[in-house]
């Protein structure tokens, strides 16, 4: 019988409820720090406060405090927001911190116990540049063994084995580094054997998602169990999204709440707004792709938590869904994207 593997054990898919499919509650994002503009250097070096928050929102990766999403203040703020998410109807969170991002599995388990929200943890590797020597030298076979162990046996946390419930986020740059090609291949091989869900983080080049899918499918991975993340900053034309969907993967809009058009990690494009995200999802529904759509926030910096003036994990539930209903999206369609699709993606029978 198929089930979903949470950090507290297996559950039936119908218990997930509304699910955020791409979030982080603790990770190290300091690799992506960018030096601040000279005009705002002092403001972005200062502690995040009401007087500096405007600068941090414009240049989120130029505040070292902001990208340290792992200290005690961040963990306390994340827990507060998970409780708010629960209060506003949230059921489950898929935590996408993989090897290289310093995933805090002990904290994830504690959150699941203390908040009542189901957490699904991921295995897999982030980009080569953030790996330590012990992981950077892994072969495809060694990666496959590691992912299998994390899913079937688990990782020991305080004397108990905690199992991962999917492979992700599996990240790559562009052109794809050889290490990252190996991690994609290992992901495809293990997905074919175990039947688990997987989630990919593509680079910001429009060709990246297609190259990832080619490597994954060639390795034996099943397209229907694969999520392509961050499409709201990667593919901007509906035609491109439809073309990607023809490969069979889920299309994930996971930057809801990011409303700053200036995108520090790719200054050649403008980040779309929540309004545009809603519009694009509605167009994709019209294209007959309702059963391939997922929504999330990808919170990975402090300024997006409510304690730091942000929107929190409940933003989609409290702000986005009412806007979608007002524009004609039905409850049945919302349930498909936020309940049914996540459950179908995450459920497997190893």
From Swiss-Prot:
It comes from Drosophila pseudoobscura pseudoobscura. Belongs to the metallo-dependent hydrolases superfamily. Phosphotriesterase family. GO terms for molecular function: hydrolase activity, acting on ester bonds; zinc ion binding. Keywords: Hydrolase, Metal-binding. The keyword Hydrolase applies. This is Phosphotriesterase-related protein. InterPro entries: AryldialkylPase_Zn-BS, Metal_Hydrolase, Phosphotriesterase. Its cofactor is a divalent metal cation. Its EC number is 3.1.-.-. It comes from the Eukaryota. Binds 2 divalent metal cations per subunit. A divalent metal cation 2 binds at residues 169, 201, 230. The lineage of its organism: Eukaryota, Metazoa, Ecdysozoa, Arthropoda, Hexapoda. One of its GO terms (biological process) is catabolic process. The keyword Ribosomal protein does not apply. It holds the Pfam family PTE. A divalent metal cation 1 binds at residues 22, 24, 169, 298. It is an enzyme of class 3 (hydrolase).
